[in-house]
Swiss-Prot record:
Database matches in InterPro entries: L-Ru-5P_3-Epase (IPR004560), L-Ru-5P_3-Epase_Enterobacteria (IPR023492), Sugar_Epim/Isomerase (IPR050417), Xyl_isomerase-like_sf (IPR036237), Xyl_isomerase-like_TIM-brl (IPR013022)
Origin organism lineage: Bacteria, Pseudomonadati, Pseudomonadota, Gammaproteobacteria, Enterobacterales
Protein name as annotated: L-ribulose-5-phosphate 3-epimerase UlaE
Keywords, alphabetical: Isomerase
Coiled coil: none
NCBIfam families: hxl6Piso_put, PRK13209.1, PRK13210.1
Source superkingdom: Bacteria
Top EC class for this record: isomerase
Catalytic reaction equation(s): L-ribulose 5-phosphate = L-xylulose 5-phosphate
Family indicated by similarity: Belongs to the L-ribulose-5-phosphate 3-epimerase family.
Pfam families named in the record: AP_endonuc_2
Statement: the UniProt record of this protein carries the keyword Ubl conjugation: no
Pathway field: Cofactor degradation; L-ascorbate degradation; D-xylulose 5-phosphate from L-ascorbate: step 3/4
EC number: 5.1.3.22
């Protein structure tokens, strides 16, 4: 019987860097997490994962089986470098090929959700053409994901195109496909001028996972928990009352810290205390 406990995961970049997934999952288990979210970012090292051999993919599956710690989701931020909205046909084609490889990788290793970065372009100037190309690229991507039975889920971003659940829902309605859903980041959502609780309620029925981090207006990374603007207890209460029962993922970038495990444990305790206050988990 599946546990009724709220699944709590940790982002790969919060844990010590390296390519040994068995060690990473063992550490996550020691720290009390149910799952780890993989990062495939714009660096060559992490992009290379999409070209892993059959044996390398099987090693990840074996590590999950041995530890009991799942890798159910991938944060695919590589499209910053190879955006689907690029006006350069070669770059856009690379972006679509990355998407194809990511979906195939997910299918092979059991990843269920690929979180997408909501940028039409990132390092270039956006315009009507980049937005049109982005929409078309999403349509092609969702068609591929549908055939593979892998969910693509749009993150709420640090970027105006996709800085609210309402905007992401526009794409969900446009695509009208069950394999395209939403993966809000309550930090990013709170850093903009949004009615955060109304936005969370609007997304219910489409939210497949939630990123948990703190932010300040204009500062979207590395804000220590409790020092930003996010009202965590209210967000957790709203999600619970709205019927959301899915996973929460603590997003941190402490892989290069002096003691990443200690940083993660501190954040875990802080977040779980707020979850307990909101009635999501039992108090420690």
């Amino acid at each position: 019987m599946l546990s009724k406990q709220i699944p709590l995961g940790i982002y790969e970049k919060a844990l010590p860097a390296g390519e040994c997934w068995l060690e990473r999952l063992r550490l996550a288990k020691t720290l009390g997490f149910d799952f780890v979210e993989m990062s495939v970012d714009e660096t060559d090292a992490r992009l290379a994962r999409l070209d892993w051999s059959r044996e390398q993919r099987l090693a990840l599956v074996s590590a999950v089986a041995e530890t009991g710690v799942r890798v159910p989701s991938m944060c695919l931020s590589a499209h910053r470098r190879f955006p689907l909205g690029s006006e350069d046909d070669a770059i856009r084609a690379q972006g679509l090929e990355i998407m194809r490889k990511a979906i195939q990788f997910a299918q092979d290793v059991g990843i269920r959700v690929i979180q997408l970065a909501g940028y039409d372009v990132y390092y270039q100037q956006a315009n009507d053409e980049t937005r049109c190309r982005f929409r078309d690229g999403l349509k092609e991507s969702v068609d591929m994901a549908s055939r593979a039975q892998v969910t693509l889920a749009m993150e709420i971003m640090d970027y105006p195109l996709m800085n609210s659940i309402s905007k992401a829902l526009g794409y969900a309605h446009y695509l009208n496909n069950p394999w395209f859903q939403l993966y809000p980041d309550i930090g990013n959502l709170s850093a903009w001028d949004n009615d955060v609780q109304m936005e969370l309620q609007a997304g219910i029925g489409h939210i497949v996972a939630v990123h948990v981090k703190d932010t300040k207006p204009g500062v979207f990374k590395n804000v220590p928990f409790g020092e930003g603007v996010v009202d965590f207890e209210r967000c957790f209460e709203t999600l619970k009352q709205s019927g959301y029962c899915g996973p929460y993922l603590i997003e941190m970038w402490s892989e290069t810290a002096e003691n990443p495990a200690a940083e993660v444990a501190k954040a875990r305790d802080w977040v779980k205390a707020r979850m307990a206050s909101a009635g999501l988990v039992e108090a420690a």
